[in-house]
């Protein structure tokens, strides 16, 4: 740039000097013509506005030999001519282009700069480089060579940089793209047909594999448990899209089947059950005993249905709604072991008959009736001599009655304020939802409560009167919902996961409240996964670990608290004990739990007594069945000899203290006359000794 400016200054000064020479008729040196030729050939460097005096040099320029082969200047009318000289005439200025440059250059304006013609016939000099017009945008910006195949779709640089190669659209490329898309469009139908065929084949293969698994006659390996093998004969219909899984374990049904098998009872109701009258009006239970039973019920069971005072269940209620009054006395009878079994049995049959009549009564049902139905759903096995009431059916029908009777269920949860009356209804509603969930997952049955109704359950915790037990019920509802969803998700069960993100999130908020239910749900999920992974040692270890945690926790429970447990707790403990019998029958926790259950049972019809007997019989069969030499191979591969004598030192002291515990219960009914407690206390010792002899 500096050289160009210097050239301009020198040229202007020299031209001015030579103008003075011409005006004085002096000779013009040859270098002046060289400068003029330079200006003619390089118009951008020497502007015509800065060397205006050259216009007056017409005489010496036109025929000078220096300009031969260069552009010849003929000047048109110029506005600067009069200013430069008064004697010199001005002619048109035109550019004559050399022969090699053709005639396709026009003068666009007075600047003298040529412009290319729009035609494509320009003849270029032989030595000039012709650049490719197919370079991509990236190579153009980098000013590098674009290594592109004429029919390619990206250059090497863009491929190596993993960026999009943007190419200018040409006629050839457009034709190539059009042909490529036409070929792809023509191939789409055939691809879709092949995909449909592959999907159909995969579906057939999957169904065939399931049938092969279901029809497998035997499973190798000693770690395959008896409970797992018993599930092979269950319904094996497809579980995809269903609301209940045929592969899920059924603890409640399992216990009922085992109990019927071991005891040999018919599990049918007596024919005269419908002709039973009112036990209270007939004087079978005297008024003093009934008052004590109501007090015991309020102390241990009233929290479930918002009954805080015996006056809430007054004597007039026995005439207006005998179902709640009779249910309260039946549940409280477990705290009075001296009540004859015949009386308890008669009460139970009367309540069953009244329940059947109530369920088909005209709607809406009274609040007290719904309270009684919720209690019966929580404790359906109060008497185990006959087939217990089906908690899933009972709670399901009761929920339908509650939807009709409880008006708040027909509104959005945010539309209403939780008051005292709504608290009492919410407690009954939560109890019904919980029992429906427990029985659905315990029997592998569908769960049909809509989500908009379940959203009302946690609203109970918004009221200041909400208790610790209310929080546990809400947490347990959420836990069983998660477990039921995972159990019905067959893909998750087939993967054999050992940790579930949904349960881990639940633990962060509620794990400190519910231990037994958490371990029970994990146990059910592991047992479900074992249907697809028969010999998974990790699953077996997790099953044993959760079973031991359940039994160890249960053995720490205080005796009065254990009697008030809902039946679901006994199913949890019993199922954990059965799993230990299945995989490790020599585990000492089995004997401890069966003795503790026997210790809790007030009579032989109680659920604890029946579960203790079932566990004892199943342990005997598991221990003696696989090996005639009484050697049992556990789930971890260790071998232990079956030796019941090792458990006798533990069992004898505990059995000796049982009568002392029952004797301590007499202070609960000090005013009861001796004739109201016949036979039971005097026969307990003989019955316990007979059972002890049987299990030892």
From Swiss-Prot:
DNA-binding stretch(es), residue numbering of this chain: 136-165
Principal cellular location given in the protein's record: nucleus
Sorted UniProt keywords: DNA-binding, Metal-binding, Nucleus, Transcription, Transcription regulation, Zinc
A molecular function (GO) term: transcription cis-regulatory region binding
Region of interest (Disordered), residue spans: 106-126
Pfam annotation, one family: Zn_clus
Top-rank taxon: Eukaryota
Subcellular location as annotated: Nucleus
Assigned GO CC terms: nucleus
SMART domains for the chain: GAL4
GO BP term (any one): regulation of DNA-templated transcription
Alphabetized InterPro entries for the sequence: prtT (IPR051089), Zn2-C6_fun-type_DNA-bd_sf (IPR036864), Zn2Cys6_DnaBD (IPR001138)
Family as reported in the entry's similarity comment: Belongs to the prtT family.
Role played: Transcription factor required for protein utilization and degradation. Regulates transcription of major secreted proteases including a serine alkaline protease (alk1), a metalloprotease (mep), an aspergillopepsin (pep1), a sedolisin (sed2) and two dipeptidyl-peptidases (dppIV and dppV). However, it is not a virulence determinant in leukopenic mice.
Name of the protein in its database record: Transcriptional activator of proteases prtT
Organism listed in the record: Aspergillus fumigatus (strain ATCC MYA-4609 / CBS 101355 / FGSC A1100 / Af293)
């Amino acid at each position: 740039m500096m050289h160009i400016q210097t050239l301009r200054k020198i040229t202007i000064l020299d031209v001015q000097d030579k103008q003075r020479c011409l005006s004085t008729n002096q000779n013009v040196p040859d270098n002046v013509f060289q400068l003029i030729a330079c200006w003619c050939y390089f118009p951008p460097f020497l502007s015509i506005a800065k060397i205006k005096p050259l216009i007056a040099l017409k005489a010496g320029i036109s025929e000078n030999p220096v300009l031969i082969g260069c552009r010849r200047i003929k000047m048109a009318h110029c506005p600067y001519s009069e200013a430069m000289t008064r004697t010199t005439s001005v002619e048109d200025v035109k550019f004559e282009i050399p022969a090699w440059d053709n005639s396709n250059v026009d003068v666009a304006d007075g600047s003298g700069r040529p412009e290319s013609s729009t035609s494509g016939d320009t003849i270029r000099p032989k030595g000039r480089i012709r650049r490719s017009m197919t370079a991509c945008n990236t190579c153009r910006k980098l000013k590098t060579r674009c290594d592109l195949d004429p029919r390619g779709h990206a250059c090497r640089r863009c491929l190596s940089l993993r960026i999009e190669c943007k190419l200018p659209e040409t006629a050839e490329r457009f034709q190539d793209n059009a042909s490529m898309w036409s070929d792809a469009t023509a191939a789409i139908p055939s691809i879709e047909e092949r995909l449909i065929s592959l999907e159909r084949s995969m579906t057939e293969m999957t169904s065939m594999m399931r049938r092969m698994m279901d029809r497998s006659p035997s499973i190798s390996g000693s770690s395959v448990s008896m409970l797992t093998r018993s599930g092979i004969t269950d319904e094996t219909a497809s579980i995809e899209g269903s609301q209940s899984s045929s592969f899920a374990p059924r603890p409640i049904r399992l216990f009922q089947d085992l109990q019927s098998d071991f005891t040999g009872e018919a599990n049918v109701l007596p024919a005269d059950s419908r002709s039973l009258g009112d036990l209270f009006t007939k004087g079978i239970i005297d008024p003093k005993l009934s008052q004590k039973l109501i007090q015991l019920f309020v102390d241990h069971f009233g929290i479930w249905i918002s009954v805080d005072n015996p006056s809430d269940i007054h004597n007039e209620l026995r005439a207006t709604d005998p179902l709640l009054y009779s249910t309260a006395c039946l549940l409280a009878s477990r705290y009075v072991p001296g009540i004859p079994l015949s009386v308890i049995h008669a009460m139970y049959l009367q309540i069953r008959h009244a329940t059947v009549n109530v369920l088909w009564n005209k709607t809406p049902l009274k609040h007290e009736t719904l309270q009684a139905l919720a209690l019966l759903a929580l404790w359906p096995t109060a008497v185990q001599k006959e087939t217990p009431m089906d908690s899933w059916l009972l709670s399901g029908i009761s929920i339908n009655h509650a939807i009709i009777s409880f008006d708040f269920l027909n509104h959005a949860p945010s539309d209403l304020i939780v008051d005292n009356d709504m608290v009492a209804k919410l407690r009954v509603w939560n109890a019904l939802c919980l029992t429906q969930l427990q029985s659905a997952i315990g029997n592998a049955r569908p769960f049909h409560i809509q989500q908009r109704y379940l959203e009302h359950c946690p609203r109970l915790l918004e009221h200041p009167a909400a208790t610790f037990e209310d929080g546990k019920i809400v947490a347990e509802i959420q836990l069983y919902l998660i477990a039921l969803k995972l159990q019905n998700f067959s893909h998750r069960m087939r993967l054999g996961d050992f940790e579930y993100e949904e349960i881990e999130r639940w633990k962060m908020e509620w794990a400190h409240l519910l231990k037994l239910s958490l371990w029970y749900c994990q146990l059910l999920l592991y047992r479900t996964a074992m249907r697809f992974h028969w010999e998974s040692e990790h699953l077996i270890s997790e099953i044993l670990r959760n079973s031991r945690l359940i039994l160890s926790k249960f053995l720490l429970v205080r005796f009065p608290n254990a009697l008030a447990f809902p039946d679901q707790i006994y199913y949890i403990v019993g199922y954990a004990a059965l799993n230990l019998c299945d995989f490790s029958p020599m585990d000492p926790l089995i004997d401890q739990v069966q003795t503790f259950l026997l210790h809790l049972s007030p009579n032989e019809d109680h659920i604890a007594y029946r579960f203790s007997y079932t566990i004892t019989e199943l342990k005997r069969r598991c221990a003696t069945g696989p090996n005639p030499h009484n050697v049992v191979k556990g789930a971890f591969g260790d071998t232990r000899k079956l030796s019941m004598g090792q458990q006798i030192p533990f069992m004898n002291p505990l059995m000796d203290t049982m009568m002392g515990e029952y004797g301590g219960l007499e202070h609960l009914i000090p005013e009861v006359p001796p004739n109201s407690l016949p036979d039971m206390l005097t026969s307990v010792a003989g019955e316990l000794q007979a059972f002890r002899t049987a299990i030892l």
